[in-house]
Amino acid sequence: MARQPEEEETAVARARRPPLWLLCLVACWLLGAGAEADFSILDEAQVLASQMRRLAAEELGVVTMQRIFNSFVYTEKISNGESEVQQLAKKIREKFNRYLDVVNRNKQVVEASYTAHLTSPLTAIQDCCTIPPSMMEFDGNFNTNVSRTISCDRLSTTVNSRAFNPGRDLNSVLADNLKSNPGIKWQYFSSEEGIFTVFPAHKFRCKGSYEHRSRPIYVSTVRPQSKHIVVILDHGASVTDTQLQIAKDAAQVILSAIDEHDKISVLTVADTVRTCSLDQCYKTFLSPATSETKRKMSTFVSSVKSSDSPTQHAVGFQKAFQLIRSTNNNTKFQANTDMVIIYLSAGITSKDSSEEDKKATLQVINEENSFLNNSVMILTYALMNDGVTGLKELAFLRDLAEQNSGKYGVPDRMALPVIKGSMMVLNQLSNLETTVGRFYTNLPNRMIDEAVFSLPFSDEMGDGLIMTVSKPCYFGNLLLGIVGVDVNLAYILEDVTYYQDSLASYTFLIDDKGYTLMHPSLTRPYLLSEPPLHTDIIHYENIPKFELVRQNILSLPLGSQIIAVPVNSSLSWHINKLRETGKEAYNVSYAWKMVQDTSFILCIVVIQPEIPVKQLKNLNTVPSSKLLYHRLDLLGQPSACLHFKQLATLESPTIMLSAGSFSSPYEHLSQPETKRMVEHYTAYLSDNTRLIANPGLKFSVRNEVMATSHVTDEWMTQMEMSSLNTYIVRRYIATPNGVLRIYPGSLMDKAFDPTRRQWYLHAVANPGLISLTGPYLDVGGAGYVVTISHTIHSSSTQLSSGHTVAVMGIDFTLRYFYKVLMDLLPVCNQDGGNKIRCFIMEDRGYLVAHPTLIDPKGHAPVEQQHITHKEPLVANDILNHPNFVKKNLCNSFSDRTVQRFYKFNTSLAGDLTNLVHGSHCSKYRLARIPGTNAFVGIVNETCDSLAFCACSMVDRLCLNCHRMEQNECECPCECPLEVNECTGNLTNAENRNPSCEVHQEPVTYTAIDPGLQDALHQCVNSRCSQRLESGDCFGVLDCEWCMVDSDGKTHLDKPYCAPQKECFGGIVGAKSPYVDDMGAIGDEVITLNMIKSAPVGPVAGGIMGCIMVLVLAVYAYRHQIHRRSHQHMSPLAAQEMSVRMSNLENDRDERDDDSHEDRGIISNTRFIAAVIERHAHSPERRRRYWGRSGTESDHGYSTMSPQEDSENPPCNNDPLSAGVDVGNHDEDLDLDTPPQTAALLSHKFHHYRSHHPTLHHSHHLQAAVTVHTVDAEC
């Protein structure tokens, strides 16, 4: 880049005399051009590439390992979707059959007990609320204290003392079921008389009665037919506040009693009729009662206020019938559907025209119902006014329910009889759950004795996601109640979740309506605590012609179909599975089968042409290698030590078998490992005789363990000989079946799955290339690390076309990468980093090395920092380069967002430089590092300049969700996913987006016994205190060069080297993110003192130059126009201000009045942006994005504009807490409600099970902006 000669400084000084300014400008330009001619970014990229290859070959052992895998003998396997889908469907059917057998067995016992009850009454009660704690103990399967020997009961208010209760007869049967069936959770019997019996017994926090008969599971089991329901709330002038509150509470109870198989609408009526405005489709159609629709309807009901106008009853019924009719016309009508209108009203008509109003209402009902063959039932609930009963009003409401139109002189239009409903009185003492919540008892009981399968929901009592299998119990025609079994979803879906046949195939499971239960885009059920959005499979498989495939899947019990898909309209994770990327189209093969005796359909998808899967033939273990399982805590390893926070050993690598290595992944995850089990694994895996029985591992796992053992000698040698050991955290190799070999050998969390980590996925997506990932916070305690990973292939002839049999990875400290940059590219350090900056970014635009990532006064978390965030000038320019970067969209259904992200072209030839004319303040060069997924860039900033990249400070919301331009600079961000609640379909624009790849899963640190921790020494002692020079300390394991005092601003007179925990990030006493997930010292305020005016000297000089030389006038004019174009991009342009980005998650910022040295490093991050004060918002809004578990962190969003904040105003209403909650056996549990984020509704970004507490502080930003608030009707 532009190396400035020493004479330049004096030339610049003389240039202040206007007559010489132009000469200086020309001279500088010529000198700069000459310097750039001497410098080649392509040569520097080659230097970096050589270093990367050396690291991969020497430190990681990629070349050696590939040579070893080339020598193995393989058997070839071609995927056959048709045969495999039948085998997999059979396994899933067997699981369901086990639970159906449990349900049928429990049903038989209940029905037999009732026969006995008739002669010898069974009425004994074991109240769940009074069980002594001594009878229970903690059970990991239920994640709470239970008794595995007895059941207990919860009672409704209406239960009489003689009610049938088979609970004690059931105990032995329920206990046997629990012992013999893995994955089983709660079992229960819910009686029609109001007794809820649950096993195992658990002590509830009881504040009142418990009405299980108004819960969705009970309702959908005793009335399995679909229900179309319209609820009308009367809020006219004659309805008092007390009556209106009763009506609102009753409507909430109805909402909580129905599920996704039903359709619902809520209307309010006074002089006009209103529908919920939170989705436009509610005005026209009924909507499936998903949790999202129920939440919106609940919000609408809560907002209803009394009206001053009289009630027009007829208008309400007219709209209700219209909704039902339009829904029937729009969808495939099912013959057994029950249609019901529920009217919550005082029944008062106007005094002047009472009879006319009544007649008009009955006439509307008569006419409209005749269009629907008199199939709609009307239920009316009379709202009492302080105990005073109006007989005329009650009679009117009864006539409405019974549709007595003849009484008012309205002739019947049809010969078909009407379905008479009922009228019930409600007052303040009414138990709404027992009355309104049981509205379904008016509907016909068709005595359908079939198992009902619920969709997945959260187990509020225990942990994880569950689904319920339930059946009704009858004695003759008498309904006794229902029996149900809650099944762990992770167990049911384990064969789908861990399906691993080849990289080119995957599987999904849907129900017979098309709802998706499991798909590769979704996180493993074991780690979820909230269900993903119930979404149709067509949105996951969003490729041309899939709609036809979907129709066939839902209509044919068995079949297969192949469709051709153009590459340019494909899914990103399909592209990753292709190996012949030159073709314009590829084939996708779908093979499916209905899982017998259930409502589920399994499908296997194969991307063609696929690479044949090569499986290792029987191998023997390396004689010199020792097989050591990772459970060092169970094995009592004498050579154990601490590798930062992890229990570890330097004696040899350890083997970790993740859940995917086991035939039953769920069983492995849910049961504790014992020493005996570990010994069995070790004996089997190291057995060359093949005589020891398999302890439940997949067939190919032993060969993978033995194959990876060949790397042991290489790593052990490097540990002794390598000069880079002080920078290397760990080395590891992982196989597709989840075998992980790691050195130093370390204790890992059993839920860890290497095949779902970013370093593994990046390597698989870039076969044969060196992939860079990070930086991210190492869960083992090593601070921020960067990973180099590389694939190992079965084929030796052409790396990129071989089947991937393993991925190798090595973790370096973050600062080591910047050290490499400084050492190999001297130009980066020639002016102390003040004007010339170097960086490395990977193919999604995230920075791996950059001055601000290692600067102690940058203060930002260094994860997920994007080039748009740190180098907005460069980002703005490279977006204009054709075919280099593409801004992509994808739909994320697990958190209901549209994600925006970048993908850079890794086949870039040559280098990139400034494209936009006039960008003289900032020159850059960018080139791909050959053989990697990364790019190296150099920026030479000769004067202050402004650029705009839209980045939110508080969350990940995009500035403008209504449009996305390829050449507009913005940080990776997200928008709410707009779904038509009535059809479940996406809006047309978002329907074109592919579904996102799976989210990165959090990694959990496995805690070890504190006593053991104190007794162990550190495996690696970096002797930080003995490192006296910055160069000896920089990037070394567990060491930090302490440069800044504890106030976060003052430079130390004598910097020194210390352990990381003493001055994390180079700041004395800074809190480690391992303590509280915050790297902050304290809250700080950005004031207007920090806002600098833009320089105007060059502009004045340009004008003078115009006067002197006509030829250069054009140049100066263009320069001036360019400067203004930058300034006009911001609301702050009038003040010529810029606010430097600040990362709020860390609650601190450096001042711009720091030393000249600091300004040089940081000044490149200046944006034009509007930053507003958001301390009034609840920290819940931030937690939706920042309160992540483990290492998952998405901290790269630093500038927010007020338009974004007002575009998505927050709703402060609490979501509807009553959903499908079989596991929630106490409505009074102290459960956390989901945080509210305006546009994202009640969905969290990740619903992970293990959550770490995160501190949240209020943030105060002050800048000269005007914010317009927007009121939202919630």
From Swiss-Prot:
All copies of domain VWFA, residue ranges: 228-443
Residue ranges, annotated region (Disordered): 1179-1227
Domain spans labelled Cache: 453-532, 772-853
Extracellular face of the membrane: 36-1095
Cytoplasmic-side segments: 1117-1274
Record's compositionally biased regions (Polar residues): 1196-1215
Membrane topology: Single-pass type I membrane protein
Keywords from the UniProt entry: Calcium, Calcium transport, Glycoprotein, Ion transport, Membrane, Repeat, Signal, Transmembrane, Transmembrane helix, Transport
Coiled-coil segments on the chain, per record: none
InterPro entries referenced in this protein's UniProt entry, alphabetically: Ca_channel_alpha-2/delta (IPR051173), Sensor-like_sf (IPR029151), VWF_A (IPR002035), vWFA_dom_sf (IPR036465)
Keyword Membrane: yes
Endpoints of the signal sequence: 1-35
Entry's localization field: Membrane
Gene Ontology MF terms: voltage-gated calcium channel activity
Carbohydrate-modified residues: 145
TM spans (from-to): 1096-1116
UniProt KW Nucleus keyword: no
GO cellular component: voltage-gated calcium channel complex
Family the entry assigns: Belongs to the calcium channel subunit alpha-2/delta family.
Entry function: May regulate voltage-dependent calcium channels.
PANTHER family, A to Z: VOLTAGE-DEPENDENT CALCIUM CHANNEL SUBUNIT ALPHA-2/DELTA-RELATED (PTHR10166), VWFA AND CACHE DOMAIN-CONTAINING PROTEIN 1 (PTHR10166:SF68)
Protein name: VWFA and cache domain-containing protein 1
